[in-house]
């Protein structure tokens, strides 16, 4: 509709106080319908908006993964159709959308991302970690925390000072 109206839509140069352009803003605040409307006016002259970084050093794909727990997959589909980079790295940590989805324990999104043909599952962030490395670390932390909690409870239940390993 808008693109066929004959009007030239200017999308460049408009930033909010977060450094969000319109693609960032709709990724954060909008819904899927807003992104579909944006898709109508994205062209080769302004496609860079999908790859630009905001003041938090994130592209629109990172914003969706980090901030939308309900419609992330639907929004990402539209953004990717417009030309967003599924393997784009945020500038502050070098994390890709897959790194961020793993870090936030968003299993459904991780599974969907891993099925995308162009996804780089072995991308390294600035800490030289793959998404798989992050998943393993998070599991190990959970296990370690569970063991530490068990040790605390054992000491409460056995104040005599007996060591947990002595009873095994």
UniProtKB/Swiss-Prot annotation:
This is I-Kappa-B like protein G2. Belongs to the polydnaviridae I-Kappa-B-like protein family. The keyword Methyltransferase does not apply. Suppresses the host immune response through NF-kappa-B inactivation. Possesses ankyrin repeat domains required for NF-kappa-B binding but lacks the regulatory regions required for dissociation from NF-kappa-B and degradation. Therefore, prevents host NF-kappa-B release and subsequent activation. One of its GO terms (biological process) is symbiont-mediated suppression of host NF-kappaB cascade. Pfam families: Ank_4. One of its GO terms (molecular function) is NF-kappaB binding. ANK repeats lie at residues 56-88, 93-123. The keyword Repeat applies. Keywords: ANK repeat, Host-virus interaction, Inhibition of host NF-kappa-B by virus, Repeat. PANTHER family: NF-KAPPA-B INHIBITOR ALPHA, NF-KAPPA-B INHIBITOR CACTUS.
């Amino acid at each position: 509709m808008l693109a066929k109206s004959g009007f030239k839509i200017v999308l460049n140069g408009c930033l909010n106080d977060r450094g969000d352009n319109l693609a960032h803003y709709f990724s954060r605040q909008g819904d899927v319908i807003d992104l579909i409307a944006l898709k109508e006016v994205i062209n080769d002259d302004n496609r860079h908006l999908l790859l630009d970084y905001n003041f938090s050093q994130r592209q629109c794909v990172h914003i969706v993964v980090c901030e939308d727990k309900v419609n992330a997959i639907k929004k990402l589909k539209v953004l990717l159709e417009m030309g967003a980079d599924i393997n784009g790295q945020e500038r502050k940590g070098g994390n890709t959308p897959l790194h961020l989805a793993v870090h936030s324990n968003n299993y459904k999104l991780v599974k969907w991302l891993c099925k995308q043909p162009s996804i780089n599952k072995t991308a390294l962030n600035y800490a030289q970690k793959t998404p798989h490395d992050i998943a393993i670390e998070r599991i190990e932390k959970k296990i370690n925390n569970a063991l530490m909690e068990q040790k605390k409870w054992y000491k409460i239940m056995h104040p005599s000072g007996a060591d947990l390993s002595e009873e095994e």
